[in-house]
Amino acid sequence: EKAFPLIRGAVEFYLGYLVPYDGYLVTAPSTSPENTFTASDHSVHSVTFGSTMDCSILKELFGNYLKACEILDITDLMDEVKAALKKLLPFKIGKEGQLQEWYLDYPEVDMHHRHVSQLYGLYPGNLIHREDKELLAACRVALDRRGDEGTGWCMAWKACLWARLGDGERALKLLKNQLHVTKEENCSLVGGGTYPNMLCAHPPFQIDGNFGFAAAVLEMLVQYQDDRIFFLPVLPEEWKDGKISGLRAPGGITIDFVWKDRCITECSLQSQTDMVRILLY
């Protein structure tokens, strides 16, 4: 009664917003948030068509709509959504080996831009999986090109991305960078970190960084894909012993577990509904 109408409304809007181009359906106009690129005539732009982030979000939206329809036994718009989903632009790899940010392989004006929008499908989305070796390598190149500096929330997002890429040590490095103490109150695109009161500094304060920091820690301890739960997927060396309780997993599962010397010694999963999950460790 609440969630489905929101999803359906978004689906209806984007079915009408997408336009055909070269055999695909793309968003137009489209941006990769706040980033700019250089066109073939050396002019600088931010608006184009078919950005990777747009396509990633729509793949997720349409996929979620189809799953919701199956659960609710609804057939409305299913054929249209399935057809549109098949025509959405696939991920593309650019000439530098990076996951492309736009439909065309434009060079970004700022290679170290704080946004990593083209990697939405890796995180927080769940479109690029551990079996997708070529795409994972392209994501790694794109993330490496961005660098490890940035605003407070940016470092949290990068930590989440490195965790998804299987690099716990790099993720931990980003978290430590984010814990850099700053007292800067004016708006700045560099020198991000954490204020003495533990609030994230863009600067100024942005709650994204605090939530993102916690999300990155959880990504390093537990990851999910379909009906699989991966325990300690990218545990950094400094965290060889630990305990976590009350972790909420997809499907309404509550997880508690303890590990020592990188080995799980206790584990409990609770759910209010019956379900089958594959536990990997």
Indicate residue ranges for each PLM-predicted region.
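C-terminal substrate/ligand-recognition segments
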Residues: D110-N186, P203-E219
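Extended, hydrophobic alpha-helical segments in both membrane/secreted and soluble proteins
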Residues: A3-L15, C154, A171, T194, ...
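Non-catalytic C-terminal accessory modules of carbohydrate-active enzymes
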Residues: E169-Y281
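Long, well-ordered core segments of solenoidal/helical folds
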Residues: L6-Y21, L85-E96, A138-D148, L175-N186
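Carbohydrate-binding/catalytic loop surfaces
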Residues: Y24-S51, L99-M111, L165-G166, C200-D208, ...
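Long, low-complexity segments enriched in small/aliphatic residues
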Residues: M78-L119
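The feature captures the catalytic groove of carbohydrate-active enzymes
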Residues: E1, P5, L15-E80, T265
